[in-house]
From Swiss-Prot:
Family the UniProt entry places it in: Belongs to the purine/pyrimidine phosphoribosyltransferase family.
Signal sequence segment: none
Organism: Aliarcobacter butzleri (strain RM4018) (Arcobacter butzleri)
Pathway assigned in UniProt: Purine metabolism; AMP biosynthesis via salvage pathway; AMP from adenine: step 1/1
Protein name, entry field: Adenine phosphoribosyltransferase
Gene: apt
Amino acid sequence: MSEKNVLDENSKNILLDSIRTINDYPKPGIIFKDITTLLNNKNAFNLLMDHLEERYKSYNLDYIAGVEARGFFFASALASRLKIGFVPVRKKGKLPSTTICEKYELEYGFSEVELHLDAFNNEKNVNVLLIDDIIVSGGTAYAAANLIKKLNVNLVESCFLMNIAILDGAKKLSEISPVYCVLEI
């Protein structure tokens, strides 16, 4: 994982304190990290966005791809700050034009994510950052990264607000993309 422009411990604690924990949601035994309390906390949200802007301003990015749905919040905000394009990675069936799709395994079954074939305006050799709110087992992120690579663009890094480190999703994803996680949970 990259170590360039890592957030300091005090700032990490501010972000952690702004994320609400809800036990047994969406089902018993799950500990859910609710980012809505970070999003509606102007100080915490802007601290995070300032950090991401500082980290990525020198990466020469052309696009930021955000994973549905919570990745959209951070990806679109950062794309706006960096004055570059935002590309949504959607669940299957949510995009209206011609798409490519990637299947991935869930705990009980499979799911799929997709991108428009022209998501990057048919440009080649562009630099793309992938963003989502959390990486757990890495299935969704791995599928999203594979989709981006299939369109012959440069996946510069995959960024997550939170990493559930015990489940090794970031480690798995690091096989195909550099990974940066703001917070380790």
